Amino acid sequence: MRIAIAGCGQLARMLALAGWEMGHHFSFIADPGEGTDCVDGLGPVVARDRYPEPAALFEALGRPDVVTVEKEHVSIALLQGLAEHSLVAPSPEAIRICQHRGREKTALQNLGISTAPFQLVEDGPSLITAVKALGYPAFAKSCEQGYDGQNQWLLRDPESLEALAAQMDSLPPLIVEGAVHFDRELSMIAARSVSGETALYPLAENRHREGILLTSEVPAANISEETQAQANHIARTLLEQWSYVGVLSIELFDEGGKLRVNELAPRVHNSGHWSQDAGVTSQFSN
């Protein structure tokens, strides 16, 4: 099978190395200015800006059977164009939802999946109104592009709120989330095939430092049958309702056994790296 990956980072490398063992061949789509050291030598690297037309890009990539992603921040128009020539998995629509925290949380709530309370804001007055409704502490995050603690603000008191409100004219739209008093952070790696077969990996307990994942303990300790059933239901609901194809990473808050979804990633995830050595099948092989 010929597989094209949008992105040239470490996750693309791990995907390609896993796929090589299965006889697959890879090519990579590089954004302008994107480094390619991680994937050099693993297959053709095609600069996206050299092929603005999807048909030409498809040919330059070697006419792949499947196009996938190693990151969610990919041009949706590009993926939609490639979808006219190849299977794009996950779907452009699933990736579009996961690119924007507001769309993501709205989609989750529409499926009856619990999240932190939230409001979307675009200016200083709407930010102040949102925090008054949600209470302190609150967390403001960019709707797009924020990850690993970047473009995020902890609002503890009126002073920190006023300071951020004064900056809103120079900031993109934000999502403001009310505090969730969780006991721990969990995550699950889930996968679904084109034929609808699903696989769920064990829950991991994750510890972060300054917003960056430090350790994952797998399987997470002291998971009750009820908690596991909740996690399985969340994962299966998303996979089935979205007709999802590929790997979906689900970050969760555990509040005394009640689970809320924090964020989704429509791709392989660093909390699933353990599966390379400790899993019968790694996340990258799916």
Can you describe what each PLM-predicted range is?
Residues I97-S187, A191-Q241:
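Active-site nucleotide/adenylate-binding loops and adjacent lid/helix of ATP-dependent enzymes
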Residues S243-H273:
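Conserved metal-phosphate-binding beta-hairpin within the catalytic cores
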Residues P32, E72, C143, A179, ...:
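Anionic group-transfer/hydrolysis microenvironments
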Residues I223, S275-V280:
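Short alpha-helix boundary/capping segments
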